Amino acid sequence: MDPDLFLRKVSTLQAGFRGFLVRRQFQSLRAEYEAIVQEIEGDLSTLQWTGGWIPKPVFLPEAKSHQSWKAEKISNPEQKLWSHSPHKDSEKELIWEEMVQKKTEKSPANPGSLCRDDSAWPQAEQGRKASQGNSQDTSVSKMENADLGLSQSQQELQEQRNHLAMELLWLQQAINSRKEYLILKQTLRSPEASQTRDKHRGQAYEKTSLHSSCVLDNQSYRDRIIGESHHAEDSSHKGRLKPQKHPDSVTSAGKTTAGSKGRELCYRNSASQLPAALESQAGGDRVTKGPDHGGQPFKETSLQQLKVLEDQIPGDLKFRSPCSRKAETQLPTLSENQNIEDRYSRKPSRSAGPCDLNILEGHMIWDETLAGQEQGSLDLIRTKPPKSQPPSAGSSGHGNTSELSPEGWKNRGILQWR
């Protein structure tokens, strides 16, 4: 056999087998493709295959296909209904005509009844047509619901209604929450809201600053009162104890400086209690003092004041006052020694406001009084006799002090220091 002929026959056989296998494979592919389209679309009405030996899938427009499918579905029930309805209508018409004829035969002499029957017939006909239309509408709606896969039972419809109501409620709540969020965001970004926030912050800061300033003012007021009382007491005692540089008073100066240092420490501890005690004593004097007692209440308050000061001073720092106990009891008429007065001449103190110091002829008379019934401080007044009177006019041989006017005795008690 010729080898060329053999090769041609073998090649044609192989081509036939290859064509068969390819066609078979394409058929399997078409079946798989149609199965996928059926699963997705639910119908193969929109799919068409075009081409010769190798077909190609083509999809028709979806809107047209859907409308045509719906029209077919709707037209078929109508045709069925209309196909059944003519026979029924004809039968009903025949029955109605027979009934009318029977009535006319039974009562031919009553033409009014015939008129009434004739008028009732069109009304019945209209009602029959309306009922037929309603039945057709309901049948069409049922068919559409069946095509769409909707349930027809009452329970399923109620469940669907509840489900739709819950979805609508959820949507409404979501819309309301979104609106509230946007409104809040807008108000926070607006300048008016920032101004109100700054205003509230400023008011809160003013309240806190006012409260702190009130506390600081009260504290500074208390410190100032205590400091003034300390300063007045220290200045008065320094004025009493500071002598002039005289050869006879060198030894007493050291004692007075040591005593003044000790008293400063003690007065700082007792200063907080001293103004209250003086005020209470002044109030008691205000109540008990009569018009005829003179300077007796002031004398008692001066003694009580000295006792309070001595009690507050420790024993090792107590200042030995040059004034004796006898001089304290005999406050209005204390003796005066002229030599000692010359030794204890004092300079006026700048810090002691109520102290008035005057120097005349070496006679030094110290009056320790209360500055007022509301003031809890000591008033040191240095008095001098007029020039027309001799220095010893108002004093005895034992050194008694010069007597003041009765008004002076009523207003102050005099404490004479030697």
UniProtKB/Swiss-Prot annotation:
Keywords tagged on the record: Coiled coil
IQ domain: residues covered: 6-35
Annotated stretches, region: Disordered: 101-142, 230-264, 280-299, 327-355, 376-418
Record's compositionally biased regions (Polar residues): 129-142, 249-259, 390-404
Stretches of the chain forming a coiled coil according to its record: 141-176
Disulfide bonds: none
InterPro entries: IQCC
The name this protein goes by in its record: IQ domain-containing protein C
Organism: Mus musculus
Lineage, opening ranks: Eukaryota, Metazoa, Chordata, Craniata, Vertebrata
